[in-house]
Structure formats: C-alpha cells, structure tokens
Amino acid sequence: VADLRAHGHEVTNIDQVGERGSGYVRVDTTDYGQVVDALFGVQDLHDGFDAIVHLAAIPAPAILSDVATFHNNMLTSFNVFQAARRAGIRKIVYASSETVLGLPFDVPPPYIPVDEEYPAQPNSTYSLVKHLEEQMAIELCRWDPELQVTALRFSNVMDVDDYEEFPGYDDDALARKWNLWGYIDGRDGAQAVRKALEHDAPGFDRFIVANADTVMSRSSAELAAEVFPGVEVTKELGEHETLLSIDKARRILGYEPEHTWRDHAPATTGDDPVAGHPS
C-alpha cells in the first residue's frame, strides 16, 4: 500500500484487519456480498476501482487446518475474482506462491533454476489452492478476453529484521533447501505488485517473484551440485544467483530487485553479493 501511494496511486485497503482511518475499509472477504458491494464503491461518493491487488489469505501451510485453509483461501479468491468481473474491474494482480513449483522439493525439480515453464507441482493443501486459483484465473480470462489477471508467485517474504538470522543458514545446506534458498524482500515484492499493475496485457500470466540472490553465503552452483546432484543446471550461475528464476518478471514486467539481505547482515564471504544481478 505504501509503495503504491508513494508512486502516485490512490489506494483503498479492503481487509478484515487494519487501522481505522482514511483508506481502510473492513470487509470479510469470505462473504461475497460484502466483497461485491465494496468493489462497486465503498460509499456513494466513491464510484469503484480501476484495479485490484488481492493479497488476502491464510499466508502459509500449517497455520490452520487443511480444511480451514482450503475453505478460506479458495472462497476468498473466487469472491474477489468474481466480484471484480461483476463490478467491471478488468485488472487483477494477486499473490500466488513459489509453493506451486514443487516445494519442499522432496522430489527434485526438473531443472535449475526453476521457472514458470513446467507444470505446477503442489504438495500441500495450501499450494493446491494456489494452483487452483491459477487455473480459475485462466478460465475467467478465457470467458472474458478483456480481463487481465496476473499471478505473482512470491518467494518467502522477509523484512529487514529477519536478515540477522541469514548467516546461520550456512551451517546446514539442507535447512533452506525446501525453497531452493530463495526469499523476497517485502519492498521488492511491493515493487513487483506495482510493476504488474502498470503492465497492460489482457489475459492470464504468472511470474516468479524473488530476490536476485539466495539466503546463503555459499555459491549457488555449489549448493545445486551438493543437494541436487542429478538435476540439470540450465545456465552458468552467478556466485549467489537465485535458483528461482526471475528472468520472466524482469523481461516482461521490468521488475528489478533493489535490496539484498547482505546489506543488513554481518559480512559474508564472496566478492559479489548479488552476482547475476545486472548493474
């Protein structure tokens, strides 16, 4: 919200949780009636919205039961997508997840770096919902050729306060193997949302959103060879280059990570903290 407002967008935050005041409206997104009413206009003086950023969800597996996670997240996304269509809103950006890529990679990925080109491999109820949301968006865009839905497959979201823990990950390469040692700084995640909103291309598309580097001080090539020795590495990797490919987001959305945990944590080994990150 702060990033969008800082870049000149007028934003209304519709959620069950928030601080009272201008720009926030409390809505239960599992209630379709509340959602569609809000999207037509929060009050008589407000005539609706140009676009929607849908981030409301139980944010990870194992926070609630599988059934509660499925019911909440699937219903919320259907309500938002359907209400947007009814309200004539033709641009939706929403949070999908890296989990559809096959996390925790107990079965190795088909290749490294992983990208958006291979079929989803959900391995939890949470990631199953994310996959079903993408499939729902594909069909809604087929029904309505003017609709634009962008799924951002966010990596593990981190804030600056989290970075002091990162050097400890080097003690065990397997500790963060579950998402190929990836992360996304919340500020760069906000940038990706903004770039997706400002991109015009009707239809459905999906993008991995991660930072340019890994959470590790060890080289990406060394990690891949040690933990996934039989998996094809499809390119020459930069020293700490992410194994969650962000090439598509860079190419199409103009997304470019501006932050790295290495600027906030004790000094680590390696001369190039974000190799693979264009200057």
Question: How would you label these PLM feature ranges?
Answer:
Residues 27-30, 51, 68-76, 120, ...:
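Glycine-rich NAD(P)-binding loop of the Rossmann-fold in SDR/ketoreductase-type enzymes
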Residues 79-123:
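Conserved Rossmann-fold NAD(P)-dependent oxidoreductase catalytic core, especially the SDR/UDP-sugar
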Residues 157-174, 179-206:
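Alpha-helical substrate-binding/gating segment
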Residues 187-279:
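C-terminal substrate-binding subdomain of Rossmann-fold SDR/epimerase-dehydratase oxidoreductases
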